[in-house]
Amino acid sequence: MSALDDLPPLRDVIRRHGLSAQKSLGQNFLLDLNLTGRIARASGPLEGATVVEVGPGPGGLTRALLALGARRVIAIERDQRCLDALAEVSDHYPGRLEVISGDALKVDVRPLVGDGEVRVVANLPYNIATLLLIGWLSTDPWPPWFSSLTLMFQKEVAERIVAAPGSKAYGRLAVLAGWRTTARIAFDVAPSAFVPPPKVTSSVVHLVPRSEPLPCALSALEKVTEAAFGQRRKMLRQSLKSLGVDTAALLKATGVEETARAEEIDVDGFVRLANTFAQLKSGAGAAA
């Protein structure tokens, strides 16, 4: 019998420790061990890998990650109430679970993960999920310290991550994710899977870093996409004026029509715009 089989049911753990999901922390607990196992497997083979988990709560996904062979799990939990429940999981997997009490937005795990393959697998707290993803996608240098991200989001956010040009969901997040990773929605999760059930469907997204994304300065790409999507209904000849360079020259040099709108430009197009913008800005600075 595995250590997972020896652990008490999650509902008993929650009841015994008096746990309830806190809306202020963006919590929704996953109690179905078949589902947590499916999330863990969506990240790929875990044998020998170090896994970073954010927001483990009572430890449902944590159990699955360890049972499926993760060499080590580093779990970051802000909610002090969950620490005793996680300690029980740690006792069943001696030396394999490290729980860090803190805010995932402030904890730098890079010094902790060591050498070898590192994956991030998490049912993210919804109130910080997008901020965490942007932080991971903005990692410097690139390729990053993780080999994949397997993350739960609200479905609307997941669709924004994987959106294609021309769709309503396509925006800055899709450009950043598409530039640095290949991303796909692995599967959807119904509200009934959570305690308490959220009002919306959730989705698990799997992202794999590109080893050699198109050369581009992240800061330039951020400025261009912010300007373009900040006024997404306007033509680029208007929306990009806030960049402070010759918009006509910028668009002509990159082969983009002045009448195009942000949602029509693919990731490669935004990279070209960002690189040309950086050159024009640098030239303007030198001239000054």
Swiss-Prot record:
SUPFAM superfamilies (UniProt xref): S-adenosyl-L-methionine-dependent methyltransferases
This protein's UniProt keywords: Cytoplasm, Methyltransferase, RNA-binding, rRNA processing, S-adenosyl-L-methionine, Transferase
Keyword RNA-binding included in the entry's annotation: yes
EC supergroup of this enzyme: transferase
InterPro entries named in the record: KsgA/Erm, rRNA_Ade_diMease-like_C, rRNA_Ade_Mease_Trfase_CS, rRNA_Ade_methylase_Trfase_N, rRNA_adenine_dimethylase, SAM-dependent_MTases_sf
PROSITE patterns: RRNA_A_DIMETH (PS01131), SAM_RNA_A_N6_MT (PS51689)
Record has Transferase as a keyword: yes
First-listed, main subcellular location of the protein, grouped into a coarse class: cytoplasm
Binding site for S-adenosyl-L-methionine: 28, 30, 55, 77, 103, 123
GO cellular component, one term: cytosol
Chemical reaction(s) catalysed: adenosine(1518)/adenosine(1519) in 16S rRNA + 4 S-adenosyl-L-methionine = N(6)-dimethyladenosine(1518)/N(6)-dimethyladenosine(1519) in 16S rRNA + 4 S-adenosyl-L-homocysteine + 4 H(+)
E.C. no: 2.1.1.182
Compartment(s): Cytoplasm
One annotated GO molecular function: 16S rRNA (adenine(1518)-N(6)/adenine(1519)-N(6))-dimethyltransferase activity
Function: Specifically dimethylates two adjacent adenosines (A1518 and A1519) in the loop of a conserved hairpin near the 3'-end of 16S rRNA in the 30S particle. May play a critical role in biogenesis of 30S subunits.
Protein family (similarity comment): Belongs to the class I-like SAM-binding methyltransferase superfamily. rRNA adenine N(6)-methyltransferase family. RsmA subfamily.
NCBIfam families: ksgA (TIGR00755)
Name this polypeptide is given: Ribosomal RNA small subunit methyltransferase A
Source organism of the structure: Xanthobacter autotrophicus (strain ATCC BAA-1158 / Py2)
Organism classification: Bacteria, Pseudomonadati, Pseudomonadota, Alphaproteobacteria, Hyphomicrobiales
Gene responsible for this protein: rsmA
